[in-house]
A protein has these predicted regions:
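Protease-associated
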Residues: 17, 24-118, 127-131
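Residue patterns forming the tRNA-binding/recognition surfaces of aminoacyl-tRNA synthetases
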Residues: 1-14, 25-27, 33-35, 75, ...
Length: 172
């Protein structure tokens, strides 16, 4: 698992990549127990400098299993958060973000000032995301109509206004 950062949860169904800072150190942390019980037993990736900021989520004594420079992580593919676009049919239609989609990419705007050091990328909804994803040949996934309503491509939130969907996306 990677603890990714976003200020716009409604864009998560359109996630196409995760950006890291190429010179930031990241840790793979094994969570023994956490206060919520959600991550116990999991291994999560987070910027090393931010481990103390996530003590509640990572538990009292998380174990660092490995460390990596961000540049070492670039190119690693991951299973998408949502499966809406990860089907053979969607790929054939060109609706998926392409062969480089759902991978870790480098971006100079990723910092450890806030967040987790891993930044969610939805190129249809952010200029930085768009330019960075274009550099890696990652296509745009746009399941929102002109009125800001989720289309049928995102069945769980179909017909919902994007800001109304935020709380449901966060709960998922």
């Amino acid at each position: 698992l990677a603890l990714i950062w976003t200020t716009t949860p409604w864009t998560l169904p359109s996630n196409s990549a995760v950006a890291v800072g190429p010179e930031i150190e990241y840790s793979l942390v094994e969570v023994a127990s956490d206060h919520e019980g959600n991550l116990a037993g999991e291994r999560v990736l987070i910027a090393t400098d931010l481990i103390p900021a996530y003590a509640k989520e990572l538990g009292e004594e998380p174990t660092v299993v490995a460390t990596y420079e961000g540049a070492e992580l670039v190119g690693i593919h991951y299973h998408p958060i949502y499966d809406y676009f990860d089907t053979p049919e969607r790929r054939a239609e060109g609706a998926a973000p392409g062969p480089n989609g759902w991978s870790i990419i480098a971006a100079d705007y990723v910092t450890t000032t806030d967040g987790t050091g891993l930044v969610h990328q939805a190129p249809a909804f952010g200029e930085d995301d768009m330019w960075t994803c274009m550099e890696y040949g990652i296509g745009v996934v746009l399941p929102v109509d002109e009125g800001g309503v989720f289309t049928s491509e995102v069945s769980d939130y179909e017909g919902m206004q994007i800001f109304d969907a935020n709380r449901y996306v966060v709960a998922d």
